[in-house]
């Protein structure tokens, strides 16, 4: 059985110049509405996440909370490596532990930032990041991961969509 991994970029956030610290930027009203619409579409298509990991930045945490609020998953944890410039290898190590401890769970969501999520997808599929995959705000990348072994360069891309195709 493969593991389904969904990489979800945070929704539209407040302007940088309005916040002294980029980490503190929340979703805008439009970002919240659009993200909620995307989340409901994913839910209505039968998706459910066994575990949601999110960047600790406010806009990503708010996006992950929306996923949880619409019923896409119950288990939600912050994961520091999903912050900008985070290390995929830290997540790969987490994944190995998760695989060993799970009970038939096979669907994960990671909420983070661009270009990081696009780069992570490239690393998982092709084994190298070239910043070619662009993920729009509230966009989704879907990957199939092998059941065992390091997923880098061994995963399959099955979805890359912007929110406009989901709402």
Show the residue positions of the predicted features.
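Active-site-proximal alpha-helix that buttresses catalytic centers in soluble enzyme cores
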Residues: 2-82, 86, 131, 135-137
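A glycine-rich beta-strand to alpha-helix segment
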Residues: 105-121
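Glycine-rich phosphate-binding loop signature in dinucleotide/nucleotide-binding domains
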Residues: 45-47, 98-106
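Domain-level recognition of soluble alpha/beta enzyme cores
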Residues: 128-158
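Short phosphate-binding loop-to-helix
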Residues: 83-100
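Hydrophobic packing residues within well-ordered alpha-helices of enzyme cores
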Residues: 63-67, 91, 120-121
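Short, solvent-exposed aromatic-acidic interface loops
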Residues: 156-167
């Amino acid at each position: 059985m493969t593991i389904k991994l969904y990489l979800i970029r945070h929704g539209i956030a407040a302007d940088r110049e309005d916040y002294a610290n980029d980490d503190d930027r929340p979703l805008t009203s439009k970002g919240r509405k659009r993200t909620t619409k995307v989340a409901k579409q994913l839910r209505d298509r039968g998706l459910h996440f066994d575990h949601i990991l999110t960047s600790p930045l406010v806009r990503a945490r708010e996006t992950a909370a929306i996923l949880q609020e619409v019923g896409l998953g119950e288990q939600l944890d912050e994961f520091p490596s999903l912050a900008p410039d985070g290390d995929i290898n830290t997540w790969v190590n987490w994944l190995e532990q998760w695989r060993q401890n799970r009970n038939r769970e096979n669907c994960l969501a990671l909420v983070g930032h661009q270009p990081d999520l696009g780069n992570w997808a490239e690393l998982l599929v092709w084994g190298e990041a070239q910043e070619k995959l662009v993920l729009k705000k509230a966009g989704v990348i879907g990957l199939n991961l092998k059941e065992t072994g390091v997923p880098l360069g061994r995963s399959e891309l099955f979805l890359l969509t912007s929110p406009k195709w989901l709402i």
